[in-house]
């Protein structure tokens, strides 16, 4: 009877960490994907403005984030966040933040691929109807991009569920 308590408690923690990290990763990934795609589509090359510079800067920061996070092992990220950045935080918070940041980089590329897969004419149609960039992206582009990106997002969720097994390295007792 006591063993089942350990298993169910571990399963609860695994599911909580996975779902919360998935939410953080989706929010972060969608925002980063929109920044990355905004840089490509908003203004002609000849147009120079402070906003254009800020978009280029934001795009460069997002590219650096994606490169660093995707190029670093998740265990290393977990240990750095636990022992260097969030030393006094609860272990479950550290796990959610770490896996959310990690998942955000992968989700950003998945969503960006979905957005780039939508025909350019869809953005032009929305803009020609007088919609702002954000409303065109939210109402026209993202629903189509999510449809094509859904299988890869499900794979990312499964990967995230498997990655929670390394939480034991920071002393979080979960399912594995």
Predicted feature residues:
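Transmembrane alpha-helices and adjacent helix-loop boundaries
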Residues: 1-176
